[in-house]
Amino acid sequence: MTATPEVQKSIEEVYTKLQGASDCSSLLKKHLTKDVVAKNKSKKTRLGATLLDVIQSGGENLDSGVGIYAPDAESYTLFADLFNPVIEEYHNGFKATDTQPAMDLGEKNVGELADLDPEGKFIVSTRIRCGRSLQGYPFNPCLSETNYKMMETRMKEIFNSITDPELKGTYYPLTGMDEETKKKLIADHFLFKEGDRFLKAANANRYWPNGRGIFHNEKKTFLVWVNEEDHLRIISMQNGGNVGEVLARLIKGLNLVAAKAPFARHPRLGWLTFCPTNLGTTVRASVHIKLPKISAKDDFKKICSDMKLQIRGIHGEHSESKEGIYDISNKQRLGLTEYQAVRQMYDGLKKLIELEKAAA
Ligand SMILES: Nc1ncnc2c1ncn2[C@@H]1O[C@H](COP(=O)(O)OP(=O)(O)OP(=O)(O)O)[C@@H](O)[C@H]1O
């Protein structure tokens, strides 16, 4: 199977557009070389995905940080000429010959994670999420409407079977959810945003809102997103800085779901996700934090990036910080264990709080 001449022409057009875009600094632009285009433009996965499916979001959104997505699991192998260097650069030097370590969520270590901010002076809230793909289904651009609905039905059955008093809750499909409820869930940081242009350009928003929804317990401290960017996003969050409590709840919830739904894992890349930035552990552990003194300094971004921390705005990726509150998380998700990913955030934040306390 080979890509049509039209698709190959579109791939070349994306390449030319990126090379001519002086304002673009995405990893796609850097690693989509003439040679990579020539070697890969005619390839097609067994499900029919091409290099165009991989690069079209970054081609349309020149402000992308990364710019590529995997339309199916095979893409990570078939288009390795592009994925491997992007993965290596994003995940702290994870090489094509490296392998994701076995899963270690840190069950035995949660006790080491004392509250980062017991006096409640800095941290507004803590959240740890991981992504999962259900075995047997491709990713967004290759999913049919029936696939989305079947996955949602399967997940509803699993949610209904949860009896743990802390975790049990209700699934709310996006279809039929009233605008007011939706807006409030998004504003309160519980639900994913709609109409993300990066995902739209990657063909990830088809048949919306069918098959999409959110499960949460009564306190909204354990949540599962269904069919947004990934098949599943499993989330634990609460106010304050008690990372240990948040992690313990995530582990409990993840184990419950995993016992009923087999997830797709790659022998080298770990848990599989739609975006290569989430491969491996898929863990993003974040706090919403106020650091008025050090965040005003010129070297704040550098201090964070030296500690492998990522800074986002208050409403998530591609949003701005408001009222001096930042979303700070681990950046690397591949090439370390789940516990180490959480620890990367934890140790870095401990240091940032010390610096804030010491700042004049
Ligand atoms: N520590 C936190 N406390 C409260 N809300 C949070 C925290 N971290 C992230 N959020 C909220 O979670 C929502 C999703 O954020 P965002 O999309 O950036 O991250 P994500 O779910 O990790 O996925 P992705 O990295 O794929 O974008 C946003 O509303 C964001 O404000």
Swiss-Prot record:
GO molecular function: arginine kinase activity; ATP binding; creatine kinase activity; kinase activity
Phosphagen kinase N-terminal domain boundaries: 10-92
Lineage, opening ranks: Eukaryota, Metazoa, Ecdysozoa, Nematoda, Chromadorea
Enzyme class: transferase
Protein name: Probable arginine kinase ZC434.8
Domain Phosphagen kinase C-terminal, first and last residues per copy: 122-359
Keywords: ATP-binding, Kinase, Nucleotide-binding, Transferase
CDD domains: arginine_kinase_like
Species per Swiss-Prot/TrEMBL record: Caenorhabditis elegans
One GO term of the biological process aspect: phosphocreatine biosynthetic process
Hydrolase among keywords: no
InterPro entries assigned: ATP-guanido_PTrfase (IPR000749), ATP-guanido_PTrfase_AS (IPR022415), ATP-guanido_PTrfase_cat (IPR022414), ATP-guanido_PTrfase_N (IPR022413), ATP-guanido_PTrfase_N_sf (IPR036802), Gln_synth/guanido_kin_cat_dom (IPR014746)
